UniProtKB/Swiss-Prot annotation:
The keyword Chloroplast applies. It comes from Populus euphratica. Keywords: Chloroplast, Photosynthesis, Photosystem II, Plastid, Thylakoid. This is Photosystem II stability/assembly factor HCF136, chloroplastic. It is found in: Plastid, Chloroplast thylakoid lumen.
Length: 26
């Protein structure tokens, strides 16, 4: 991926719904 979504592309599509919120989770 690119930019801020770099890490989110690694996780399942289901988790992508969290988007930026996942940053605090991880």
């Amino acid at each position: 991926g690119t930019g801020i979504t770099e890490e989110f592309e690694e996780v399942p599509v289901q988790s992508r719904g969290f988007g930026i919120l996942d940053v605090g989770y991880r």
